[in-house]
């Protein structure tokens, strides 16, 4: 299990152990608002998807206003950013607090699957 560090009241950091020294650090940020029922499970799925990958930092950013949402790369809650870029190419930015849906093999869901997240992390890792 990783260590939780509080940097700001709205930002939690969980570091997963590095297993392979040759891979670079990756930062995954989960952008959410409190009314979203899926943001905590998103963190659990990202953690599961990152298992076995080196030096992955998982952070959470709580969005509280439409203005904040408009100023961020936010495509609805939960938005999962890898090194500041949406993990999925089909992201459509929104300017208000809204829930997001993801296309999965079983249809539209409020979260991507662990497999989809693992593929997104590995794609991003291979680009570095």
Put a short name on every predicted segment.
Residues 26-48:
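Local sequence-structure signature of Cys/Sec-based thiol-disulfide redox active-site neighborhoods
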Residues 56-66:
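Thiol-based oxidoreductase modules, predominantly thioredoxin-like and allied folds used
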Residues 72-76:
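Thiol/disulfide oxidoreductase modules built on the thioredoxin-like
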Residues 78-87:
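A short, hydrophobic beta-strand/beta-hairpin element that forms part of a small beta-sheet core
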